[in-house]
Regions:
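Conserved ABC ATPase signature
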Residues: 151-155, 159
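Conserved ABC ATPase "signature" region
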Residues: 129-147
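Q-loop/switch helix immediately C-terminal to the Walker
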Residues: 103, 109-126, 133
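Catalytic Walker B motif of ABC-type/P-loop ATPase nucleotide-binding domains
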Residues: 176-180
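Conserved structural motif at the start of ABC-family nucleotide-binding domains
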Residues: 22, 36-39
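Conserved ABC transporter NBD signature motif
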Residues: 76-84, 93
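Helix-to-loop junction immediately C-terminal to a conserved catalytic motif
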Residues: 68
C-alpha cells in the first residue's frame, strides 16, 4: 500500500504571478522499506499561504524537511524558481528556504547574540544584522528592547520560539516551512507569532509559506489553500 498525495486546491488569487516559486514533481520518500508518499506533485505560488494537513503518520513533517533539503527523497525532484535542486544549488536554496519546528534549537548566550550568530553561517554572510527590523518585530509582539539582552537559558518555551521566529524572519527567506511551530504554545503567544508571520509576508507579498498544524481553527485563520496527505490503495 502506498500513501499518495491528494491535493485540495482553491483557485489561486488573481494577483499572484503565473510562475510558481516552488514545484514538487513526482516526489517519493521511503522509510523502513515503505513508501510514506509517492507521486507527490504540487506547486507553490508567490504570496500563497498553504496548509499541509493529514493524519498522524502521513508524512507532513517528512515533506517539509525534504523541501528544506534536510531529508532525502527516493524519487522525483524539487524545483525552486525554475532551478532543479541538486547538491551544487543546495547552499543557495537553503539561504532562501527556512524550516521552523515545534522545539527550536538555540545557541548559548543572549537573545541578540542568537540573532547575530546566524549571520556567521556561510549561506547568510552576505546579509547584515538589522536591529531596527528586530525592534519593529518586538513591538508587534509587545516585547520591549531589553528582551534582546535576556539569556537564552532563562527563556520560557514560548519565548524561545519567539527567538526562533525572529532569527528566521530577519533573514528574509522566500519561503517559510512551518512544522507545528506553535503546537506547545499558549493561545496568545501562538496568535502573536501568526501576526508576526503575516507582517513578514506583508513586507514582501511574493513571500510564501507552508504550515502544518493539528488546529483547524488556526489553519483557517492563516492559510488560503490546503494540501492534504491521505493514504490511498
Amino acid at each position: 500500500m502506498k500513501d499518495r498525495l491528494t491535493i485540495n486546491q482553491t483557485t489561486k488569487p488573481e494577483l499572484l504571478p503565473n510562475n510558481p516559486i516552488l514545484s514538487v514533481q513526482d516526489l517519493g520518500r521511503i522509510v523502513e522499506q515503505r513508501w510514506i508518499w509517492s507521486h507527490l506533485s504540487f506547486q507553490l505560488f508567490p504570496g500563497e499561504r498553504v496548509a499541509v494537513i493529514g493524519a498522524s503518520g502521513s508524512g507532513k513533517s517528512l515533506l517539509l524537511r525534504a523541501l528544506a533539503g534536510l531529508d532525502p527523497v527516493q524519487a522525483g525532484q524539487i524545483v525552486f524558481q525554475g532551478q532543479a535542486i541538486n547538491s551544487h544549488f543546495m547552499p543557495s536554496y537553503r539561504s532562501q528556504i527556512i524550516y521552523l519546528q515545534q522545539r527550536p534549537a538555540l545557541w548559548e548566550g543572549t537573545v541578540e547574540e542568537n540573532l547575530q550568530q546566524v549571520y556567521r553561517l556561510a549561506v547568510h554572510r552576505h546579509l547584515i544584522y538589522n536591529r531596527k527590523l528586530i525592534l519593529d518585530y518586538l513591538l508587534l509582539l509587545h516585547k520591549t528592547p531589553d528582551f534582546l539582552q535576556r539569556p537564552v537559558s532563562a527563556l520560557s518555551g514560548g519565548e524561545a520560539q519567539i527567538v526562533a521566529f525572529l532569527r528566521a524572519l530577519q533573514l528574509s527567506p522566500a519561503i517559510l516551512l512551518l512544522d507545528e511551530p506553535t503546537a506547545s504554545l499558549d493561545t496568545g503567544t501562538a496568535q502573536s507569532l501568526e501576526a508576526l508571520v503575516a507582517a513578514w509576508q506583508y513586507e514582501r507579498p511574493q513571500r510564501a509559506y507552508l504550515w502544518t498544524s493539528h488546529d483547524p481553527n488556526q489553519l483557517e485563520r492563516i492559510t488560503n489553500r490546503q494540501i492534504t496527505l491521505k493514504e490511498k490503495d
